[in-house]
Amino acid sequence: YTKLPAEAIDYFESIGNYLNVVSNGKLYKCRSTIKEMLTLLPARLFIQTHRAFIVNKRKISKFNAVSVHIGELRIPVSEKYAKSVMQKGF
């Protein structure tokens, strides 16, 4: 069991009933769903970009209507969440 401060988390990726939690290049696993995690995270800090991804807004280096980037890593933005991502204007 590892406790991570929200600010240190780069993103979450849903894999069934588990989440991959990535922080500073390290991978952690947690038993939770995207929906459950969204209720626990500060909305000012995180945004859902896809049914399978939640991203730390402060870690985004660039974005457009189809993807957000954390450094060189490209994370998809689905059509459902594109408007929200573009309105936030990181």
Identify the meaning behind each predicted range:
Residues 1-70, 74-77:
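Conserved binding/recognition cores within well-folded domains
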Residues 73, 77, 81-90:
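Eukaryotic intrinsically disordered, low-complexity regulatory linkers and tails enriched in Ser/Thr/Pro
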